[in-house]
Amino acid sequence: MLPSQSPAIFTVSRLNQTVRLLLEHEMGQVWISGEISNFTQPASGHWYFTLKDDNAQVRCAMFRNSNRRVTFRPQHGQQVLVRANITLYEPRGDYQIIVESMQPAGEGLLQQKYEQLKAKLQAEGLFDQQLKKTLPSPAHCVGVITSKTGAALHDILHVLKRRDPSLPVIIYPTAVQGDDAPGQIVRAIELANLRNECDVLIVGRGGGSLEDLWSFNDERVARGIFASRIPVVSAVGHETDVTIADFVADLRAPTPSAAAEVVSRNQQELLRQVQSAQQRLEMAMDYYLANRTRRFTQIHHRLQQQHPQLRLARQQTTLERLQKRMSFALENQLKRAGQQQQRLTLRLNQQNPQPKIHRAQTRVQQLEYRLAENLRAQLSAMRERFGNTVTHLEAVSPLSTLARGYSVTSAADGAVLKQVKQVKVGETLTTRLGDGVVISEVSAVTKSRKPRKKN
């Protein structure tokens, strides 16, 4: 009989599955260094090979989606560094690794150091965006920390000369490759901060291999950039080259030329902006002057409409119209009277009594005389009223007042002067007389004294 607490019994499938899950979950992703052997690539495009060292070996698979990113062709006997996941092929119980990335062993070890330093500095907050310093805009002096014989310096100076020839540049020459390079780069950064001549620094070099660029992955350089009080722009290698210095710097430029573009002003663009602003200002001034001219024309037209001479002309027209109406009315009245006389004469002739005719003629003569007298009296009264109206209009006309020896003086803004306090010495005054205008300049202002009251 079996004991009461019998041990767990696994099927082969369950055992392999359990081991696979343990390997995948507990081990996770690892970096492995070894020598390639038995490398094959079937039609599927996947890679199958063995990684080995002097004492052991392990089977490896690298699927097509992953091996497409490898930049070299693996060779038998080549030392490589791979990043892989450990798993178990359950049908055969074979323990193997699934490779995600592969690098030659030398670069691979450097890449591993790079990732370790990157994680360390990131954990310390050296990459924090909130700690990045703002670049000056515009920069008044640029410091360049690079090799004095490298192509990077030539590219930077060429771009700065093209974009902003007047921008001062101070070069802090240093080695950018080799064992002494990190220390020299740090000392150059410290010197630039000590001399405090520049308000922005470009730290970088031209392109190269990972080993060539390794000085900018050095922890000392990273901490030197982070400690700089002057904003730092990193410009290391080409656009695809990313170093620790790029993460720590206040701004990363993909190339040295791009760094020069970032820290400099494009004077041609500034000139275009100034010219554009000038054009907009000229258009605004033209628009303003056009509006002022239109407003002046409107005001001038209104003043012309209100001119005393124009008002007198309108009154004269009205009087002439009334005179014509009056003359027409008198003519109509005389015409009607004549017609009435003719009718009466006709009636008298029809009756033909001589006495009545005589009396009627006498009566008619009297009526005619009275009518003529009345008409003459009315006409005389209307003419007298018309003459009085014309005389009154001429008396109240400003032109008549000016013709009698008076004048009207106004200030430069057109205001009519009534008191001496409206005038200041040096102002230009306009005096209108009966026959013209006098322009004068005030040389003195004297206010008349009020007479003292006698006790």
Curated annotation (Swiss-Prot):
It is an enzyme of class 3 (hydrolase). It catalyses: Exonucleolytic cleavage in either 5'- to 3'- or 3'- to 5'-direction to yield nucleoside 5'-phosphates. GO terms for biological process: DNA catabolic process. Coiled coil: none annotated. It is found in: Cytoplasm. Its main location: cytoplasm. GO terms for molecular function: exodeoxyribonuclease VII activity; nucleic acid binding. Keywords: Cytoplasm, Exonuclease, Hydrolase, Nuclease. It comes from the Bacteria. Its EC number is 3.1.11.6. GO terms for cellular component: cytoplasm; exodeoxyribonuclease VII complex. Heterooligomer composed of large and small subunits. NCBIfam families: xseA. This is Exodeoxyribonuclease 7 large subunit.
